[in-house]
Amino acid sequence: MSEQEQKQEQPIENAAENSAQKPEEVTETDVQTEQNVTDPLEEAIARVQELEEQLADAAKKEQDALLRARAEVDNMRRRAEQDVEKAHKFALEKFAKDLLNTIDNLERALATPANVEDESVKGLFDGVELTLKELLATVARFGIEPVGLVGESFNPEFHQAISMQPTEGFETNQITTVLQKGYLLNSRVIRPAMVMVAA
């Protein structure tokens, strides 16, 4: 083969080699392009998942806040109802405390020794007794009841002990003497009974 023929064949072989190499290069470029295309797609999918998680967290927080707000409203409503109920139930407390002095005075008047044989004194005595009974019946209708009777067990919630002394016929912590009656308004102490207790 002549040199010229060899030179002509070499470009053909080189061209064949170059063309064989080019598909490899194109393939690598195509793969890189596909990876570049895939990467933004994967990034977008990852971003969507991240945003969905954030949205789910935000929805959960909003749901929690809504439940807390509802609970707070229910608590406020319940407290308001209780306040109104207490206001109705104990609205008479101050008035009742003032009435207790009148009841005490009427009871003292009846406890005072008097000549009941005298008709004028007997009529007055009967009138005071009827007035006291009517007053006690009226206050009882409004939930006011006396507490602290001789013979009851001492209870510090309802009674105030003035003194303790050994007394025959009474067990320890039994009320022996009531110095001033106590009263409850709807089971709430408005005045404790002042008592003497057996030791």
Curated annotation (Swiss-Prot):
Matches recorded under InterPro entries: GrpE, GrpE_coiled_coil, GrpE_head
**Keywords, alphabetical:** Chaperone, Cytoplasm, Stress response
In this chain, composition skew of type Basic and acidic residues spans 1-10
Which Gene Ontology cellular-component terms appear in the entry?
Answer: cytosol
**Which superkingdom is the protein from?**
Bacteria
Instruction: Extract the GO molecular function terms from the UniProt entry.
Output: adenyl-nucleotide exchange factor activity; protein homodimerization activity; protein-folding chaperone binding; unfolded protein binding
Cell compartments where the protein resides? Cytoplasm
Q: Region entry Disordered: which residue ranges?
A: 1-43
Q: Does the keyword Chaperone apply?
A: yes
**Compositional bias per record (Low complexity), positions renumbered to this chain:** 29-38
An example GO biological process term is: protein folding
| Similarity-based family | Belongs to the GrpE family.
Provide the assembly information: Homodimer.
Q: What does this protein do?
A: Participates actively in the response to hyperosmotic and heat shock by preventing the aggregation of stress-denatured proteins, in association with DnaK and GrpE. It is the nucleotide exchange factor for DnaK and may function as a thermosensor. Unfolded proteins bind initially to DnaJ; upon interaction with the DnaJ-bound protein, DnaK hydrolyzes its bound ATP, resulting in the formation of a stable complex. GrpE releases ADP from DnaK; ATP binding to DnaK triggers the release of the substrate protein, thus completing the reaction cycle.
Name it. Protein GrpE
What organism does the UniProt record list as the source? Answer: Actinobacillus succinogenes (strain ATCC 55618 / DSM 22257 / CCUG 43843 / 130Z)
- Taxonomic lineage of the native organism: Bacteria, Pseudomonadati, Pseudomonadota, Gammaproteobacteria, Pasteurellales
Tell me what gene encodes this.
Answer: grpE
